């Protein structure tokens, strides 16, 4: 598809959540575009080998905020349901989780499950993390978090009375879930505006810098998190 776009005279390309975020991926396509003088920018994570302007949510900061919220509620056994580790956003989320746990709960082991960004992946992660005694679970996507909620209920527990769950994205329907999901809101509008303006600047002849700009997220607290239940 990329070659087709170039052959049809596309002026520039914005890549969103593509192979540019995969640390094991083939970056040849991006190198060829640069060699051909096609302006490009990326959104949602740049692997170290990618040489292009990038724009993304500060995933490390986001996950740290989520874990800190659970710690403030009295949770100690906190788990992370994350996506494939080869992806840059997953690596950053794991780093944020590790930072928060080591600073706030240094006596607790890290409880991490790598799974898919799917409802089914969330269910699987929930079952594994509940076996480890987790009372709080941070997820790498809202869809995954909904799967975690289902997995918690499969075991006869409830959210948030027994287990608190935090999502990631703040998708449009999330406030209407049962319970309404506490989640990380990405500044999508700001990221998109910056990506487009940078691409337009390249089209006007401005030389790009191969740096990545990270945007601050917000933690939106709803009803899927509560104080840790004490027997």
Question: Predicted segment positions?
Answer:
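Bacterial carbohydrate/catabolite-sensing allosteric modules
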Residues: 4-12, 21-231
């Amino acid at each position: 598809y990329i070659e087709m776009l170039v052959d049809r005279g596309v002026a520039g390309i914005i890549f969103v959540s593509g192979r540019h975020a995969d640390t094991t991926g083939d970056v040849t396509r991006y190198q060829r575009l640069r060699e051909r003088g096609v302006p490009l920018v990326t959104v949602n994570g740049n692997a170290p080998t990618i040489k292009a302007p990038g724009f993304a949510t500060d995933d490390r900061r986001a996950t740290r905020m989520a874990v800190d919220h659970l710690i403030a509620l009295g949770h100690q056994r906190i788990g992370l349901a994350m996506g494939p580790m080869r992806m840059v956003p997953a690596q950053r989320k794991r780093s944020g989780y590790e930072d928060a746990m080591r600073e706030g709960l240094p006596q607790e082991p890290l409880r991490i499950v790598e799974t898919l960004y799917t409802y089914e992946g969330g269910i699987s992660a929930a079952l594994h993390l509940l076996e480890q005694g987790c009372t709080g679970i941070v997820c790498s996507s809202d869809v995954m978090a909904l799967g975690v909620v289902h997995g918690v209920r499969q075991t006869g527990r409830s959210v948030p009375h027994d287990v608190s769950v935090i999502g990631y994205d703040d998708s449009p329907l999330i406030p209407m879930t049962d319970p309404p999901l506490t989640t990380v809101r990405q500044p999508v509008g700001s990221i998109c505006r910056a990506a487009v303006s940078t691409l337009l600047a390249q089209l006007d002849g401005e030389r790009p810098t191969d740096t990545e700009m990270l945007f601050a997220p917000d933690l939106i607290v709803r009803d899927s998190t509560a104080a840790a239940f004490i027997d």
